[in-house]
């Protein structure tokens, strides 16, 4: 489906953005999250300039994203190691099973 205009409120300002209908709930949730972040920053930092608050919030979000990307990379690397270990274990078990089968076959001859 094509994007449709959606009105959202960010820190007291109205914004109209285009958004696919199936993503409107996510957009509204993101707007609520941003509003909460801006409000929390305003209280914590005592900064009243909205533009500064938006930049600080953007930097915080970028930092959080970088941390999550690092966690994802670490997790993927860990899973790759585990998969390699499992693969080696399976290959070793199959080789041993093959040797056992060969020995048993030789006993019957």
Swiss-Prot record:
Protein's organism: Pectobacterium carotovorum subsp. carotovorum (strain PC1)
Entry protein name: Cell division protein ZapA
Family: Belongs to the ZapA family. Type 1 subfamily.
Compartments (UniProt record): Cytoplasm
GO biological process: division septum assembly; FtsZ-dependent cytokinesis; septin ring assembly
Record HAMAP family: ZapA_type1 (MF_02012)
UniProt GO cellular component terms: cell division site; cell septum; cytosol; plasma membrane
Domain of life: Bacteria
Function: Activator of cell division through the inhibition of FtsZ GTPase activity, therefore promoting FtsZ assembly into bundles of protofilaments necessary for the formation of the division Z ring. It is recruited early at mid-cell but it is not essential for cell division.
NCBIfam families: PRK10972.1
Coiled-coil region(s): 21-99
Keywords, alphabetical: Cell cycle, Cell division, Coiled coil, Cytoplasm, Septation
InterPro entries, A to Z: Cell_div_ZapA-like (IPR007838), Cell_div_ZapA-like_sf (IPR036192), Cell_div_ZapA_eubact (IPR023771), Cell_div_ZapA_N (IPR042233)
């Amino acid at each position: 489906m094509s994007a449709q205009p959606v009105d959202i409120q960010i820190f007291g300002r109205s914004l109209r953005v285009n958004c696919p209908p199936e993503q409107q709930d996510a957009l509204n949730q993101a707007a609520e999250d941003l509003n909460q972040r801006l409000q929390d920053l305003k209280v914590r930092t005592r900064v009243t300039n909205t533009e500064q608050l938006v930049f600080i919030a953007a930097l915080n979000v970028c930092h959080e994203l970088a941390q999550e990307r690092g966690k994802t990379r670490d997790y993927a690397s860990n899973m790759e190691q585990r998969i390699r270990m499992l693969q080696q274990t399976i290959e070793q078990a199959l080789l041993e099973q093959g040797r056992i089968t060969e020995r048993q076959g030789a006993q019957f001859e």
